[in-house]
Amino acid sequence: MSIYFPIHCPDYLRSAEMTEVMMNTQPMEEIGLSPRKDGLSYQIFPDPSDFDRCCKLKDRLPSIVVEPTEGEVESGELRWPPEEFLVQEDEQDNCEETAKENKEQ
């Protein structure tokens, strides 16, 4: 069993008051957009004629060629994996191989 308690809130408008508000407000058709003072306008949505032009440009991918570089790393350039990491891996591999050889003997 549920008990209903009416909400007593000063901000709450009863339906009759809300109907009165809705009937007395200005219709949206009569509310016009006033031009800006400087007279400049801006477009929110893209122009449909620009859509075809953009689609034609997107059909072709840009041709970017990246060539691998050999030699020293320039200052500030990062490479992965770092050289220190490669040295540590080689040392670990050598240790593992030595351990396997010792077990086999």
Swiss-Prot record:
The keyword Phosphoprotein appears for this protein: yes
InterPro entries registered for this protein in UniProt: LBH, LBH_dom, LBH_dom_prot
One term under GO cellular component: protein-containing complex
Region Disordered: start-end pairs: 86-105
GO BP of this protein: negative regulation of DNA-templated transcription; positive regulation of DNA-templated transcription; regulation of MAPK cascade
UniProtKB keywords: Cytoplasm, Developmental protein, Nucleus, Phosphoprotein, Transcription, Transcription regulation
A Pfam family this chain is assigned to: Lbh
Sequence ranges assigned to domain LBH in this UniProt record: 18-104
Domain of life: Eukaryota
Biased composition (Acidic residues): 86-96
Principal localisation: nucleus
Family membership: Belongs to the LBH family.
Function: Transcriptional activator.
Name this protein carries in UniProt: Protein LBH
Lineage: Eukaryota, Metazoa, Chordata, Craniata, Vertebrata
